[in-house]
Amino acid sequence: MSDVFAKLGLTDQFEACTASSTFIQQLAAVQIPDSAFNEWLFQDFIFVRVFAHFLASTISSVPNDPKFSFLSETLKGGFDVLKEEMRIFKEKAGDRGVDVPELPSFSASLDAELALDSAHLLVELRQEILRFSPFNDAYCTFLAVDLGAKSSSTFAERIAVLWAAEIVYLTAFKFVLRSEQFQADAGESLKGFMEWWGGNPAFDAYVDTLSVAVRLVLETATEEGKEVVKRGIRKVLDLEVQFWDGSLSAGK
């Protein structure tokens, strides 16, 4: 676990959406109901599309400051990876008999993605996807509207939120992969899917780079700025808990 959570007093909240999450614990024990995992798969497929839009907003807000010169290319690489992630989600969903919806396609460029109206994107999703769950809608609204390109949010808040969301997945799925029960009983397809986040050196490196950026932000932030960052991270952790728990509840 990153010491950033400890410094911000968010250790318990981070644990709640990683190792202490009922969804993650059941997944690690290979006891999660298929219906709950399939619900998460369906909802997260939608979420990734909106997350890509949020990432484009974050890239556009990287300051022209030498100390952040390393960041833009890394984030652009992350944007490209999300396209592959959606393909993998769709493939795994098909393997499990889950029909994922047709979503607005990725824009050809970051500029084109930024030109999309965030609120309109969400309206389109709500109209077209009958199973767009409230917990997913809340998370997507936070990212695309509250922190979107047309919002008053800062780079500091966006990069902290991006990092928090990514390190939750990294940590949660590393926990799953370390489980002896999971390694003994899970199928190879599921193991491979979890390794996309929890066993992927490139994803480790990506999250490490985001961590460096967040530390730089906190080093120079005012007390008010630190509080804004903390609120953003705490919001992500709360929304992650709702996403895991909502998937479990919907799958009953």
Q: Which functions belong to the PLM regions below?
A:
Residues 1-24, 201-212:
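Acidic, low-complexity proline/glycine-rich segments
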Residues 199-233:
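Long amphipathic all-alpha helical oligomerization modules
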Residues 16-20, 47-54, 85, 135, ...:
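Amphipathic, well-ordered alpha-helical segments in soluble domains
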Residues 27, 58-62, 146-150, 173-180, ...:
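Secondary-structure edge/capping motif, primarily at the C-terminal ends of alpha-helices
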Residues 22-35, 52-73, 148-151:
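Helix-loop segments that flank and shape redox-cofactor active sites
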